From Swiss-Prot:
Transcription factor that specifically regulates the neosartoricin B biosynthesis gene cluster. Residues 17-43 bind DNA. InterPro entries: Sec_Metabolite_Reg, Transcription_factor_dom_fun, Zn2-C6_fun-type_DNA-bd_sf, Zn2Cys6_DnaBD. Keywords: DNA-binding, Metal-binding, Nucleus, Transcription, Transcription regulation, Zinc. This is C6 finger domain transcription factor nscR. It comes from Trichophyton rubrum (strain ATCC MYA-4607 / CBS 118892).
């Protein structure tokens, strides 16, 4: 019998490249391949011997990483000392990988990538009993800071051309313009002139070198949050494609650049700014608890960078640090309210570190500014953000501070919030710009929410907390406050001036729940007939916006709606449409819900003092023309809360139905509200905010 010759060395095959294999698309195996060339990315070819298949797959022995051209090892007898060094190296790699996976197990939900890593370890451990084992382990990139295995990339599938969205100057410039219009006025963490010089004029950003990882991640985050702020109409007008397509590409780019910049380890404040913008965009796009989970990283990174203290001596650096820290406090407050937990930043820490930035425009200072700049009067670039910062501070005290129990202290906090907020709204003409219009109406919503939170706190009553009794002499009803918030949200979603800010405004579930419960116990049939279409529209919009966010909240609202619908069908009969109602964003919704008109424009006002006289304030000092603004401010602060009613900022009688309600007994109204809170706690849902969506 002729003796079989030695086995011929297997030639390395040109397999699918790494990116095509990751994206699960067909690769033409060129160098570079056509897919990578069209996407504008670097093609990483894979050349190695083909792996055995079928019955021979179980006999596979992986190739040594030091010799990718080596033949595949098969089960044959080998000397006892063969592969000892490789086995020791393998065990060390496995030990480190196991430690990484164990550190991830503390998370409430393990990502798909984490589970795949555990499966890889288990399959590897089952095969290390052979001495001749040479393994090429999975690639672990320590530079990504563990973000990929934490699930930062999510489940979004990459699309062709996603990597070129930053390098495409036309797209990046358009998204930057969208950011300056829709995002920058409400999320004020960047310096507008520096951003324009960088992304619109092509200059370097704040002295960073070209293609710095932190700057690239910030640019990608700006594009991502700008894409989420687009409406479908704006997306087609600017990019000739759907909004979902732009958002998917921008999100994938943002996540990739963030992983490269390693925000968990980076000492740059710019990287944290990019990470925060990513969380803002992700929260707008994804209502799940992913952002609530990732907020822990943002808070820890901010503390590691010493943001609460703001030790930077430069005026520019101080302003940027203050803006970023308070924006993190705001997002921490918002995200924790929809989940069964209190904010990560405690009330004491948020109060002690509350140092708001200057009420100025971005054009008033530059990165080289070292001297202090005084606050401006009137509407500035930071007005809305400053109001939001005061909102989260008041919301923490009213909802998460155990010492704030009695009605007097709660009303004092509300009065303090109103005084600080109204000072920022001097000489604001809502007809001047969409930003001024949006700020005007959102502040009314915030004031209503603060008053509603003082009357109906969200702290669960365990019996040891006294129930705050509302002051009936104020003439403001609970249902009117709740309806005012819902109508203001609907106004932003129907008025063309609110188009750029609709991504930021959703229906808060707390005023919605209060309005539903108050309709159940209200005895005024005419009032319920006028209020119920507003409640129905808000409920439908809430279900569409936050589907998947909190099952307990959705279940509680559905139970309330079913109960009230059943009662209204019996009491009102066929005169009221119970199951069908207008939805936000429709053409007829404004007429159906009697949306109020905006206050008169500045053209019909003869002086700055007359502008304040259009508000329902009876203080004579506020209506005199020619008064010193400082004196007007002092008069505003010294005025009693009964005389200052910011809830009535030139509102039509249709907006508030005050004076038409029959006040129900306090114990009956409280019983309905406590039932809602108890239901949420039974479903393991935490407290939430009354005036932040």
């Amino acid at each position: 019998m002729e003796k079989r010759g030695p086995k011929r060395r297997q030639q390395a095959a040109h397999l699918s490249c790494e990116l095509c294999r990751e994206r699960k698309v067909k690769c033409d195996k060129l160098d570079p391949c056509t897919n990578c060339s069209s996407a504008g990315v670097i093609c990483v070819p894979v050349r190695r011997p083909r792996l055995p298949r079928g019955a021979h797959a179980q006999r596979l022995r992986r190739i040594s990483p030091e010799d990718p051209e080596a033949p595949i090892q098969i089960d044959i007898a080998s000397p006892p000392d063969t592969g000892t060094i490789a086995e020791d190296d393998l065990k060390e790699r496995i030990r480190r990988l196991e430690a990484l996976v164990d550190s991830m197990r503390s998370s409430n939900h393990i990502s798909k990538q984490n589970q795949e890593a555990q499966d890889t370890i288990e399959s590897t451990l089952n095969g290390i009993d052979d001495d001749s084992l040479l393994i090429k382990g999975p690639r672990v990139h320590p530079s990504d800071g563990g973000l990929r295995i934490l699930g930062l990339s999510g489940s979004s599938s990459p699309e062709t051309g996603w990597a070129s969205i930053i390098e495409d100057r036309d797209i990046s410039m358009q998204l930057c313009q969208v950011y300056l219009l829709n995002v920058d006025p409400v999320i004020k963490i960047l310096h507008r002139p520096s951003l324009e010089k960088w992304m619109l004029q092509g200059q370097r950003y704040l002295g960073f070198p070209e293609r710095h990882a932190a700057v690239e991640s910030l640019g990608a985050a700006i594009c991502y949050v700008a894409a989420t702020s687009l409406t479908e109409t704006q997306s087609w007008a600017r990019f000739h494609t759907t909004k979902s397509s732009i958002v998917a590409r921008a999100r994938r780019t943002c996540e990739t650049t963030l992983e490269k910049s390693s925000p968990l380890l980076s000492p740059e404040v710019t990287t944290l700014q990019a990470f925060l913008l990513y969380l803002v965009a992700r929260r707008s796009e994804d209502p799940s608890r992913a952002v609530w989970t990732l907020m822990a990283f943002a808070v820890r990174i901010a503390k590691a960078l010493d943001l609460p203290r703001g030790t930077d001596d430069n005026f520019f650096g101080q302003q940027m640090r203050k803006r970023l820290w308070l924006a993190i406090c705001l997002l921490d407050f918002q995200t924790s309210l929809s989940q069964p937990s209190e904010p990560l930043i405690t009330v004491a820490e948020a109060t002690s570190s509350f140092s708001p930035p200057k009420h100025i425009n971005d054009s008033d200072f530059e990165p080289t500014t070292s001297h202090d700049i005084p606050d401006r009067e009137g509407l500035t670039d930071t007005t809305f953000s400053l109001v939001s910062y005061h909102v989260q501070a008041a919301g923490r005290l009213l909802n998460f501070e155990p010492s704030v129990k009695d009605n007097g202290s709660r009303q004092q906090h509300v009065q303090h919030f109103e005084q600080r907020t109204l000072r920022l709204l001097f000489y604001c003409d809502p007809e001047s710009t969409p930003y001024a219009w949006f700020t005007w109406h959102r502040i009314q919503c915030f004031v209503s929410g603060a008053r509603l939170s003082a009357i109906r706190p969200l702290i669960y009553q365990h019996g040891d907390h006294p129930i705050p009794i509302p002051d009936t002499n104020e003439g403001t009803s609970i249902l009117s406050l709740a309806l005012n918030i819902l109508e203001k949200v609907q106004l932003v979603h129907t008025d063309p001036r609110g188009e750029g800010f609709r991504w930021f405004v959703t229906v808060p579930w707390q005023p919605l729940a209060i309005a539903i419960s108050e309709c159940y116990i209200c005895q005024d049939r005419a009032l319920v007939q006028r209020a119920w279409p507003i409640v129905e529209a808000a409920f439908q919009q809430h279900e569409a916006d936050v589907s998947g966010s909190s099952k307990a909240i959705s279940t509680t609202l559905e139970r309330l709606m079913c109960r009230v619908r059943g009662k209204l069908l019996q009491s009102l009969g066929a005169s009221t449409k119970i199951t069908t109602s207008p939805t936000f964003g429709t053409t007829n919704a404004a007429n159906t819900l009697s949306v109020p008109h905006t206050p008169p424009s500045r053209s019909s006002i003869t002086s700055s003092g007359d502008l304040l006289s259009n508000w329902s304030w009876t203080t004579a000092e506020l209506s005199r023309p020619g008064e010193d603004p400082a004196l007007l401010t002092e008069a505003l602060i010294s005025t009693s809360p009964q005389k200052i009613d910011p809830l009535l900022f030139s509102l039509d009688s249709q907006l508030l139905i005050a004076g038409q309600e029959q006040l129900v007994e306090a114990d009956q109204s409280w019983a309905a509200w406590e039932e809602v809170i108890a239901s949420l706690h039974d479903d393991e849902t935490g407290r939430a905010d009354m005036f932040l969506s």
